Amino acid sequence: MIWRWVVVTILSAVACFHSSSHAQAVRISYSGLSGQNLPFWVTYEADLYKKYGLNAEMVLISGGLTNMQAVMAKEIAFTYLGGASPIQAIAQGADIVVLATAYGLMPYGLIASKNIHAAAELKGKRFVVSRLGGIEETAARVALDRLGVGARNVSFLQAGPDPLRIAALESGAAQATMLAPPGLFAATSRGLNLLADLGALKIKYPASVVSGRRSYLIQDRAVAKRFLMALIDGLHVYRQNKSFAVKVLEKYTKLTNADILSQSYDYFAKNNPLLPVSDGETIQAAVPTDKPGNRKVEEFYDNSILEELEREGFAKTLSK
């Protein structure tokens, strides 16, 4: 339960009234167990959706493509995932839009099995990702190109969440993967080799975005606004209360090593914005270059609700 040090405002009082009398059911999802999902989990665990009048059901749907399919089928209202899948869907004409960018840097490290010490040794080897076509494969291609290996020289295989991919490297079933904290730190603590840290390079990329249907934004804008109010509140709780956030990270990742959990929190918290607006340069990094047409980058995201909340001074009330 959220600590009661958040300043009570007229806005939150109204939201609380609505939450107790007319809670709006909303189904939301997240795509994986990496640390960049932590603000989303904190928002849920701190009961902030209820605070803003939403009765949220949160589910894990592994992989960006499957999340997009659920959103387009109207099974999910909002999903928290890497930017590649929604941006790809928008490029193909889908009724999708990015509503917020909660983490705008590439946070992955290239991890190799214990017997591989240089990137050149990865040629001809098996490279596992959680889902083919997802953000980890994108990160892998960036890393391999920067290391001079070339993604065409490895075989990409789908292997599921972090623990399964770490196990694949330890068993010899695969030789490399991409991991974000806490999986990244868990892997290196087990003796697996870090060949490249994309996070240290500060590469702009929409690693964690909120996406939904553009038509939903038009038809149920009030619900979308309350959802984003809850997320902004969650970002403030996440940044201001490390001990609570670390407990949430432990719950979702099932990791118990206090050093890894703390290190993972610190890795992300320093770069998480309190107002998760999207910017064109970050979004552009995930726009496919092989799609015809003259679509402008601004067509991929909509900051209008966040800008409205900024004009209203919403985030400032949470920082007091």
Give names to the regions the model predicted:
Residues 1-3:
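N-terminal secretory signal peptides that target proteins for export/translocation
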Residues 5-16:
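Bacterial N-terminal signal peptides
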Residues 84-85, 156-157, 163-252:
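Pocket-lining segment of extracytoplasmic ligand-binding domains
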Residues 134-154, 229-260, 299-304, 308:
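Ligand-binding clefts/hinges and TM-proximal coupling segments of bilobed small-molecule sensing domains
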Residues 288-320:
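Conserved C-terminal helix/tail region of periplasmic/extracytoplasmic solute-binding proteins
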